[in-house]
């Protein structure tokens, strides 16, 4: 356990992001005093009009009052966020601060990236599929839900005006890039293909997603994670099952492997950007914080999340693929493989489904703020 002292620089969580901060004061566990920047002891409760307010007097109106009841028997730290106005200085518990080192710097940068990308993605309206809109704006939830349950076929709404979105493109094309027989398709032709881009999504899986939406947004529950059958396991099971069917065809086999590898990479990259409901963001951040997910150590999102989150990605694919440059042949190979994967999952729902659990009051108030 690291011991923190006044004047030390640390990383601190404030809302969903991590900032650089300096410890101005601290109170250790059961101590009956506060240690300030000069390593002097201060009383826990300020006496009214105390003359001992020395050099902090000029912003005394900003000083966050120390709350003895709240911090009883707990170690806590009075932080100043670097570059912020001192009115944001606050007392925080040990769970909010982290050592100032490379690994935590990586976490900080990843969260900064997520927030930027989230804004970029919202602006670009890449997500055009009704179901995915569900995850990004709350207005259409009820409406798209009705739509979701009424038809068993998801059709992309081809409205994304971002054909030049490289990242999005490369993620979705990489899955079948070298299977493209003819990548010089004219954009007109591809528009026709896209208007017919249908994914037959079995009604029983749609039902899972409707319930999933209800549990999280209405009942404020979370999928119980890490999943017993995480996504990489499901894809592995499916690969084994499909390999038996394709034994004689090495070309099809290599396409299958490419699609499944691409799907897993795509999931890991897109989870925090487009596949989580707002209420789940904090759960994801906690996984990062506790190293339950740590891409640097090869502990990936697909090792933790399960079938519900995989289905959210699959049902979004027509919308995501509407910005791709894949030709019609590759697209139809990809779509039919995804449909086959859906049927496979449908037959094994009892095995793969996860439970939902209520969150703690702390989680609930933080996640909704």
From Swiss-Prot:
Recorded GO MF terms: histone reader activity; methylated histone binding
Sequence ranges of Low complexity compositional bias: 126-135, 150-191
GO biological process assignments: DNA repair; DNA replication-dependent chromatin assembly; negative regulation of antisense RNA transcription; nucleosome disassembly; positive regulation of transcription elongation by RNA polymerase II; regulation of DNA-templated DNA replication initiation; regulation of RNA stability; transcription elongation by RNA polymerase II
Pfam families named among the record's database cross-references: MRG (PF05712), MSL3_chromo-like (PF22732)
Start and end residues of each stretch annotated as Disordered: 43-66, 126-191
All copies of domain Tudor-knot, residue ranges: 9-97
Main location per the UniProt record: nucleus
SUPFAM superfamilies, A to Z: Chromo domain-like
Coiled-coil regions listed in the entry: none
MRG domain residues: 193-368
Subunit structure: Component of the NuA4 histone acetyltransferase complex.
Record function comment: Involved in deacetylation of histones, chromatin assembly and chromosome segregation. May act as a transcriptional oscillator, directing histone deacetylases to specific chromosomal domains. Component of the NuA4 histone acetyltransferase complex which is involved in transcriptional activation of selected genes principally by acetylation of nucleosomal histone H4 and H2A. The NuA4 complex is also involved in DNA repair.
Name under which the protein is recorded: Chromatin modification-related protein EAF3
